[in-house]
């Protein structure tokens, strides 16, 4: 294998000089992975533009070996952190793409363990992938997401084709025939949630009782024996969602709390109907003083599910007992 596989590759160019390119790389072998990934990285390196890679360690080694000395010009991130949780990846990508690079295109290759967290996590990854097409539509960036068809479920591969406008293989791009516009995908793939357990602890609130809800949530968090930072994150997320319910959900609601051996849950229900197809997925404007609650919660929680139900709008926050959100880069 040559020390620098970029040297022999010609740059076929990028369609358009601005805007997002979002493609899925579906592969079944190490060679198919390299044949699809290397052209992406080489284009960025040849142009002297930023290249970021967040893939599992064994894939990163393949890329480093293939790139040779040029791998030093690639920013390699630990995928176990960068791609651990959909909301955290969304926040990290937002921070990375928003940096001022004087119009240079940004190149990103990412691969998470898309199926590893169970069906609910896999579905959330797919919703996040779909929303990227809206959230970063104006970003001058080429984002390629790799999927190992040899180990992933057929449903996950089908979702990849539905949430990425393009497919790439061997350095060649094609339109994904299965692609669904984000609003259509969101409508067809809402979160599926079981009802809270009958023994969930519940507290009602309105604008006059926000302080008591926060104190009640603090007491509940203390009983969970969380670390100080972890408990603080939980309380921030609960506060944001309860405040959001008061301001936008009819002025009142009910919060339910329960736990499992792996996770803690808070579900906030308030009157109303969900009207936004991408609640909390779109990055707020830098100067936006309000409307950040759901976005912040997605950066803190391991999962945030929002749905319209018979009781109104339900926002369910899931916190891992062990995982904590990484500090912003």
What does each model-identified segment do?
Residues 34-38, 129, 210-214, 239, ...:
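Short, well-ordered alpha-helical scaffold segments within catalytic/effector domains
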Residues 191-196, 243-329:
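Conserved beta-strand-loop-beta-strand hairpin that lines the nucleotide-binding pocket
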Residues 49, 141, 226, 251, ...:
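Short glycine/serine/threonine/alanine-rich loop segments
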Residues 42, 238-243:
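Amphipathic alpha-helical segments that form the core helices of the histone-fold
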Residues 55-58, 238-240, 259, 270:
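Short glycine-rich, polar/acidic loop-and-turn segments at beta strand-coil junctions
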Residues 207, 211-240:
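Conserved short strand/loop->alpha-helix "switch" segment adjacent to the catalytic nucleotide/phosphoryl-transfer site
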Residues 1-207, 322-329:
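Non-catalytic sensory/regulatory segments that transmit input signals in bacterial signaling proteins
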């Amino acid at each position: 294998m040559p020390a620098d596989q970029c040297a022999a590759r010609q740059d076929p160019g990028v369609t358009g000089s601005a805007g997002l390119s979002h493609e899925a790389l579906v592969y079944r072998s190490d060679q198919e992975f390299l044949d699809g990934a290397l052209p992406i990285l080489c284009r960025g390196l040849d142009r002297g533009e930023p290249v970021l890679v967040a893939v599992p360690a064994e894939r990163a080694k393949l890329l480093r070996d293939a790139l040779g000395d040029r791998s030093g010009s690639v920013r390699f991130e630990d995928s176990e952190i960068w791609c651990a949780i959909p909301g955290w990846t969304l926040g990290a990508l937002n921070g990375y793409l928003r940096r001022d690079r004087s119009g240079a295109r940004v190149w990103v290759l990412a691969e998470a363990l898309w199926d590893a967290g169970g069906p609910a996590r896999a579905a959330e990854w797919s919703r996040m992938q779909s929303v990227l097409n809206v959230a970063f539509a104006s970003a001058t960036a080429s984002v390629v997401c790799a999927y190992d068809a040899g180990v992933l479920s057929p449903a996950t591969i089908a979702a990849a084709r539905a949430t990425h406008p393009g497919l790439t293989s061997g350095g060649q791009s094609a339109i994904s025939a299965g692609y669904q516009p984000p609003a259509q995908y969101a409508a067809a793939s809402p979160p599926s949630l079981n009802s809270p357990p009958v023994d969930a602890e519940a507290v009602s609130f309105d604008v006059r009782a926000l302080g008591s809800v926060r104190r009640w949530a603090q007491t509940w968090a203390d009983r969970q024996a969380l670390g100080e930072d972890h408990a603080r994150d939980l309380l921030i997320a609960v506060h944001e969602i309860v405040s959001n319910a008061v301001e936008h959900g009819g002025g009142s609601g009910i919060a339910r709390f329960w736990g499992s051996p792996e996770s803690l849950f808070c579900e906030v229900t308030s009157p109303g109907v969900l009207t936004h197809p991408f609640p909390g997925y779109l990055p707020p404007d830098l100067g936006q003083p309000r409307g950040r609650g759901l976005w912040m919660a997605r950066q803190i929680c391991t999962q945030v599910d929002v749905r319209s139900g018979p009781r109104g709008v339900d926002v369910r926050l899931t916190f891992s007992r062990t995982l904590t959100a990484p500090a912003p880069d």
